[in-house]
Amino acid sequence: MDICKRITGLEKRDGIYLVHTDCADLKLVFVTDEIVRVRASFDKELAEESYVLATTAWADRLDPLFAGERTRLTPVAPAVEEGEKTLVFSSAALRLELDRDPICLRLYDAEGTELYSTLAGCPFTLDSNKRVTAYSRMEEDDCFYGFGEKTGPLNKNKEFLRERATDAMGYDAQKMDTLYKHIPFYIRLSRRSKKAVGLFYHNFYESVFNMGKEKSNYWPRYTYWQADGGDIDLFLLGGGTLKRIVDNYTLLTGRPALLPKRALGYQGSSMYYPELEKDSDDAVLGFIDTIKEEGFPIDGFHLSSGYTSYNNKRCVFTWNTDRFKDPRAYFAAMNEKGAQNVPNVKPGILLCHPWFDEFVQKDVFVKDSKDPAQCAVGSWWGGPGAFWDYTKPEARRAWKDYLIENVIDVGTNSVWDDNCEYDSLLDKDARVDFDGKGGTIGQLKPLMCTIMCKIGGEAVEEHDPDARPYIVCRSGSSGIQKYAQTWCGDNYTSWTSLQYNIPIITGMGLSGQPNEGADIGGFAGPAPDE
């Protein structure tokens, strides 16, 4: 096991500081006066290749993919003091101190208030299973907010949380973990100082947060984050207040999408109508008329995947013409009524899909870890399926083309990305393209959905440059707010869900995603007796 215990050297490279320790390199960058990056790398590769960051202060291999939406700043040059026992890096707003031996990192604001501290002599570790862990100190009554989409109370003090996107239909909104998102970011608010600090772990392996759930007599009270691989790539966000920290977090990962006005209205949704044996189009149009006759405003309709039924299987991009006789005429009628369709698409492709061989020829799927010539196969709706690899440029282009031709051009600029957690793909070593470098699904899984939403919006704009895309999604990573409106999935129909969906949505707001909602009446289970 590798444990960072002491500093062995310091060097400066183009405004970036590299702190050498006895077992890892620490890369320090002041992105702004209020944002400092501390990246601990045990393999010392330190490759820059992010699908998430909207603001950087360094070159990134994936910069061309995000041209027009990523800003590169000049790193802030901190004042540096190299003492015998301590290194100090100071910006206008933050001071980062590093004790040399035993190594300990502490972050202070300009007034000298301590915002963050690692455990002395044990800040960062790498175990024999290649899991990385970052330990930080806490006070007993600290408040912890964020973590993306999480059940239970808003404050996660003394909670143990997993970051793993899951298809969690019928979840208990008070007690269960995990849900659909993977957002490794939280805000620590000290009750004593009334100051807050944000911690964003830029790593998308499956991970856990222990927020004081355990206690050891040999250490002060602590929390930790632990991931199944990768670097400890920590962004410490100052600003003092929750509002300012969320602002700094969305500076890093992207500002929320500006949605079309209709996205704020009532969006009808029902699996019932699209799954009728026939004439689903007439049934949906009749539903819209009834809603209007009753005096309710309606601005859209989430068209569930029953429209794609082929031999009683959901096959994305196909149309069931028994249910929807003339899709273009149906879409035009819905648009005339002011209730644009938001059609459901999914990244899983059944092996029995009528176009499956065509997809294989285009080489668009995640690959098997043992035989890269074969697709990785997992459970899917209706049978075994393969999964689109959105980290491959050719696969992204193919998805756009199919989406435009078979969905968008039919008469919509809205897309509903669903069932995109890749939860049923159990082989974490399945191979993905990683934009030419090669990687594993375990390394990049939650990013698939976010990239899917990005290219869905691009497809809408390619089809109609004047359109403002409306992308709706159930899953997502940090940065999903740039591209999509989200919701907390297939909740259970109960008064408990109604109550706890509020802190779930609020927690997402504190995680940079204000465009989060819930199935208000629930999705799974019977109606309550009351």
Segments (PLM) and residue ranges:
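A generic structural motif
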Residues: 270-273, 520-522
